[in-house]
Amino acid sequence: MNSSFSAPAKKSLGQHFLADRYYIDRIVQAVDPRAGQHLVEIGPGQGAITFPLLRKHGALTVIEFDRDLIAPLTEAAAPIGALSIIHRDVLSVDFTALADGTPIRLVGNLPYNISSPILFHALDHAAVVADMHFMLQKEVVDRMAAGPGSKVYGRLSVMLQAYCDVTALFVVPPGAFRPPPKVDSAVVRLVPRDPATVHINDRRRFADVVRAGFGQRRKTLRNALSTVCEPAHFEAAQVRPDARAEQLEVADFIRLANVEPA
């Protein structure tokens, strides 16, 4: 039974609504909601994932910016379960306050135009997030899960993998959406690491080091990091200054960032 409704996609909001039952079911199976968990969906759209999750779990919080979707979501959800709708820009939502002591599980078909800001916003609240299941452009998922030496290994890869276990799950073709996007999508799972195991002394400095390293990725680290690292830092962190950012493991960036400035 599918309770999703029809609504026009708004290009300005980067909307592409999932419509293929096979992929909807695969996402719900990947999330596998259990009793007592606090599920939060970002951008429910026409309810393709919303209503199967609600039917399986009984309660769901959704964050939707498009006011035209609020009434139909509310109406369609009424006979299924308890749907709580937050009508706001997701980047303004305080996930820590929303969790209210219970870890939240984030789910969503993220708008292509703001997927990276949403990822970093969720990362800021990783301490209260149990896991995340997101659908994004495949190229973004490839970057998220990439390892050292890959052409797509970069700032996004390091920043996310420093704080989360990242697993690309499966590809979703354009034909599964209405309207179809021009590129493949993919579903990814992120599980925040135990804060006690994330040995980053200063998150801002870590971000600065990673940003500088990949900002000039063709340069050696000695040159790319000249504004944030001194020569002695490389020796202290046991990192070769003649290497390039794409050759470093996540742990190498963490060690570099953790070296105390002279």
From Swiss-Prot:
It comes from the Bacteria. The gene is rsmA. One of its GO terms (molecular function) is RNA binding. It comes from Xanthomonas oryzae pv. oryzae (strain KACC10331 / KXO85). It is an enzyme of class 2 (transferase). It is found in: Cytoplasm. SMART domains: rADc. This is Ribosomal RNA small subunit methyltransferase A. S-adenosyl-L-methionine binds at residues 16, 18, 43, 64, 89, 109. It catalyses: adenosine(1518)/adenosine(1519) in 16S rRNA + 4 S-adenosyl-L-methionine = N(6)-dimethyladenosine(1518)/N(6)-dimethyladenosine(1519) in 16S rRNA + 4 S-adenosyl-L-homocysteine + 4 H(+). GO terms for cellular component: cytosol. Its main location: cytoplasm. Belongs to the class I-like SAM-binding methyltransferase superfamily. rRNA adenine N(6)-methyltransferase family. RsmA subfamily. PROSITE patterns: RRNA_A_DIMETH, SAM_RNA_A_N6_MT. The keyword Cytoplasm applies. Specifically dimethylates two adjacent adenosines (A1518 and A1519) in the loop of a conserved hairpin near the 3'-end of 16S rRNA in the 30S particle. May play a critical role in biogenesis of 30S subunits.
